[in-house]
Amino acid sequence: YDRKPTNGAGFVCHGQRFVGGGEAVVDLLAAYSTTVLDALELKHGPSHMEVKLAPGSGAPCLVEVGARCHGGEGYWMSVADECCGRNQVCAALDAYVDAAAYAKLPPRPPAALAARGRLKYLLFHKGGTLADIDAAVVDQITALPSYRGHEFFVAAGAAVVPTKDCFTWGGVVKLNGADEAQVDRDYAFLADVSARDPGLWVIA
C-alpha cells in the first residue's frame, strides 16, 4: 500500500503496488504472515493481511487479517495476472477443486515479474458538488502507456468530500507494464491531475 497523511487524516491509501518475490521485504512478510495465520489457526482457504513495518527497526506489525481473498471487488486480479501469470482468486479455486493444479503453484510471486503493476486511487482534495469529470483529462489518462483500465465511483452531481478513507475515493486506475519508470511516471501523473484544481475533478 501507498499510504500517507492526506487531508488531515494520517493513513490514507493512495494506491497499491504488486511486489515480486525477489524483494527483500517479501521473505520477512511471508514468514510473519505464516506465523499470524498459524496463531489464528487459519489452516484452509485464502487470507488477506495488512502489515506495517515499524519505523527504525523495520519489524512487522499486524494491522488486520481477514479469512478471505484480497478485496476491492477483485479489480486487482488482471494486474496480478499480467505481473506473474496468476492471482489469488484463481489459486483459491484451484485449492478447492483442483489439488493437482494447486500443488504446482509456487509459494510466492516470482522474483522477476513480467510487469510492474499498480492500482492508483483517485483522491479528492476539495469538497463540494462534483460538477463534471473533465473528459479531456480522462482522454489523457486512457492514453497513458501503462493504462489498463479505470472505474469512477462518483458521477456529476454527487456531493464529494476530501478523501480520508476508502469510502471517499473518487475512482481507481489500473496501471501495468514492463517499464517500471514509466509506470511510476503515470502513477505520478494521476496523483497530479486528481489534486489539480481544476483538473480531473470539476468541483463547484
Question: Where on the chain are the PLM-derived regions?
Answer:
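Active-site nucleotide/adenylate-binding loops and adjacent lid/helix of ATP-dependent enzymes
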Residues: 15-31, 181, 190-193
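Peripheral (often C-terminal) accessory segments that flank ATP-dependent C-N-forming ligase machineries
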Residues: 93-204
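Glycine-rich phosphate-binding loop of ATP-grasp-fold ATP-dependent ligases
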Residues: 2-21, 79
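A short, polar/proline- and glycine-enriched secondary-structure boundary/capping micro-motif
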Residues: 6-11, 72-76, 143, 195-198
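Short beta-strand micro-motifs enriched in acidic
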Residues: 52-56
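Protein kinase-like catalytic core scaffold
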Residues: 61-64
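Residue-level preference for beta-strand/loop junctions
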Residues: 43-45, 59, 167
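Active-site "cap" helix and flanking loop/linker of ATP-utilizing ligase/carboxylase catalytic domains
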Residues: 27-49, 66-132
